[in-house]
Amino acid sequence: MKKCRGRPKCPRRVEQTPDITYFKPRGVPLSDLEVVSLTVEELEALRLVDIEGLRQEDAASRVGISRRAFWEDLKSARMKVAIALSKGKAIEIKGGNYIRAESSDINEDADT
């Protein structure tokens, strides 16, 4: 099934980028694992709601997108993390389309 193309995603404001970008099951070489890719803005959605305890509406405002777009990012992030944890896959955090909150530089990665 072909994915529908709609409006391009607008950049999200991200306050924290991760220092550590890989997580994997212990005792299994990375070369033997399937990898799930989580974008920086998906990680930010998880951080704002699940760690900082913000409501989705407040988190969406902080990131600079609609509540619906934020919900899609959060849903995607939770699904990817759940799949990786339940199926023993590695998680790589990379890419996306975001702006660092304290700068106006856009980091756009076409791979996502």
Curated annotation (Swiss-Prot):
Residues forming coiled coils: none
A Pfam family reported for this protein in Swiss-Prot or TrEMBL: DUF134
InterPro entries: UPF0251, WH-like_DNA-bd_sf
HAMAP family (UniProt xref): UPF0251 (MF_00674)
Family from the record: Belongs to the UPF0251 family.
Protein name per Swiss-Prot or TrEMBL: UPF0251 protein MA_4245
